[in-house]
Amino acid sequence: MRLSNRFEKHVLVAAAVAMGATAAANAAVVYSGILNFSCAIDTDGTYINVETGQLTNGPASLVPGWDVNPYRSSSGSGMNFFSPTGGGMVSAAAGVGSAINLSAGTLIGASSNFSSATATISFGSAAGQWQYASNNIVGFRFVSSAGTTHYGWMRFLMGSQPASGNLVTRTVVDFAYESVAGASIAAGVPAPGAIALLGVAGLAGTRRRR
């Protein structure tokens, strides 16, 4: 057997094992894929229906049944979140109007603390604070069209710190949620890198067919 063939065989086996483990761990996770959607920096902001995958810059009437609404208030730290009844963003304490930046792998579920209807963010170096010019992950809960509570995460790429004011840019990179009602989800899972593994397997298969 040629060395290249043996290498491709090992790649396929490793990819299959890894994909099987990923599928088992995330069988109920619904992932958006990479979106890179630029949010409007105004008081309407962006309305996101995580079940249908629809997101657009306001008004709210454009996205029926929306679940997450990042927007900019006329004053504040740069971005706010508004949640419909039953929703909320993961916060440092229950009912506190803040949305914290989560480390990858943090579990989001019934035992998490959630904000009230409106939540703000703050930038800084302390745990839970958001970072300029970086990806930040926020956790959320929402009530599905079936009336059940689900948990998810959303990744935002925040722009560089503005010279003045609170006009920092914000981009929805991706999001995911648990399709099983009440089930917890790990922040940032599945990661884009895990999905890229499919491309590795596909490449190896293509080379073998030649």
Model-identified regions with their sequence ranges:
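Short, threonine-centered small-residue motifs that mark membrane-proximal processing/anchoring sites
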Residues: 4-30, 178-206
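Membrane-interface capping segments at transmembrane-helix boundaries
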Residues: 209-210
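A domain-level signal for the mature, folded cores of soluble proteins
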Residues: 28-152, 157-188
